[in-house]
Design a protein with these regions (language model features):
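Switch/communication elements of ASCE P-loop NTPase nucleotide-binding domains
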Residues: 46, 50-69, 73, 78, ...
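Conserved strand-helix element at the start of the C-terminal RecA-like helicase core
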Residues: 231
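Coupling/switch segment of ABC-type P-loop NTPase heads
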Residues: 1-65, 87-89, 95-97
């Protein structure tokens, strides 16, 4: 993505990829003048600061592989317009270094789940320090994530968003239900044509299909205690 464009354009002028890149730079507290500075050492130091900040703030929540590290870089790309005029753009590229396998891959070549997780944390981290309380409504988030990554996603919400904001989400996944906090859960059941959908915290009156995610969450929690508990 064009670094100058994402630093200067308004939000409605940027696509999803550009918005994610800008959110990452804002999260890292990046200085635009340093990122585009002609002096190599100054530009390199700012890129390393960005890498450290993003790795610390985002990738610490990806427990499936704690040995990942963000590697942002800025390259120059020559563009030619319709009149044959040439211009040089500073292009931001993001790679992910995997210390476990001793290689790096472009961000776009990682799994859909990883890209979604990374992008969500980058975009929603801006709410952490917002002075205005907001209500975040998420419809079936983290669908493409492994069960462990869904637990990481909940940990991010619990630690970074929930202390200052209200977060509501819908889910059918047992891994998105916290067994120790069932008082927060509401189930939605389609009762009949006359009643329509009913939202309740009374699990005893709910049909088995609706209760399945809760049963799965409690069963997984019980299995974890049986296999992992020191007792």
């Amino acid at each position: 993505v064009d670094i100058t464009r994402i630093l200067t354009a308004s939000t409605d002028q940027l696509d999803e990829q550009e918005l994610t890149a800008r959110a990452l730079l804002m999260l890292a507290g990046a200085e635009g003048d340093y990122l585009t500075n002609a002096e190599y050492e100054r530009r390199k130091r700012e890129l390393e600061n960005v890498a450290n900040a993003i790795t610390t703030d985002v990738l610490k929540y990806w427990s499936q592989n704690p040995e990942l590290r963000v590697m942002p870089d800025i390259t120059q790309k020559t563009m030619t317009d319709n009149r044959g005029q040439h211009s040089v753009l500073d292009e931001l590229k993001i790679r992910i270094w995997d210390n476990r396998h001793q290689l790096s891959l472009p961000f776009d070549e990682h799994s859909t789940g990883f890209r979604w997780f990374f992008s969500f944390l980058a975009a929603f981290s801006e709410f952490e320090y917002s002075d205005d309380p907001v209500v975040l409504l998420l419809d079936e988030p983290a669908l493409g994530l492994h069960g462990r990554a869904q637990a990481d996603f909940l940990r991010f919400i619990q630690e970074r968003l929930a202390p200052n904001h209200q977060v509501l989400y819908t889910t059918h996944s047992p891994f998105m239900v916290q067994p120790g906090k069932l008082e927060r859960v509401r189930v939605v059941e389609d009762k009949s044509q006359d009643l329509g959908c009913v939202i309740t915290s009374d699990f005893a009156t709910t049909d088995p299909d609706t209760l399945f995610p809760l049963q799965g969450a409690l069963g997984y929690d019980l299995a974890q205690h049986l296999f992992i508990s020191p007792h």
